[in-house]
Amino acid sequence: MVIKTGKHIVCVDMEKHYIRSEDLIQDSFRLALQVYEDGYRPNYIIGVWRGGAPIGIAVQEFFSVLGVPSDHIAIRTSHYKGIDDRSTEVQVFGLNYVIKQVESDDSLLIVDDVHDTGISIEKIVSDLQTACKKNTPEIRVATPYFKPSKNKTSRTPDYYLHETDKWLVFPHELDGLSIEEIRANKPEVSDLIEKITKIIR
């Protein structure tokens, strides 16, 4: 069920999984190790803004320590309704740098926080293939979390750690939570909770 509280929309009656900062960074390094142990050596790493960006940073750092240098960048996707107002279209921003740099013998890793519908990742890969043509590099996808029941594409992530159907609440996320949920599950903002409460109520 979705309810509105002032300017904010809050989902209730849905099981949430609160991810701690230390768990996410550990999973990011574990994800990088999984990619490395599989023998994949990306020389380009793309972090999908927002959630994939910090994970992408950790993956890039891990590879760097292991002696695998890579160029790295964050890109963004935006969802909007199509002409028929029934289908969701995806627009990708920030790929130009990669498109101009990559060659067919390069290896590219796309990093996101969660693979749910898969529509954004599918669009990113499609845009890369369309723009790069014969220079399209090998492309693989890595994410800590995968939601198979939500996947609307034929693609699954090449690398992932956890399968889940829960509502994932990442360390940086506050929007969509009630004050009570923030108070109970976000110790990082415990010193600010009273000020937050006065502002949004």
Placement of each model-derived feature along the sequence:
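PRPP-associated nucleotide enzymes
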Residues: 1-201
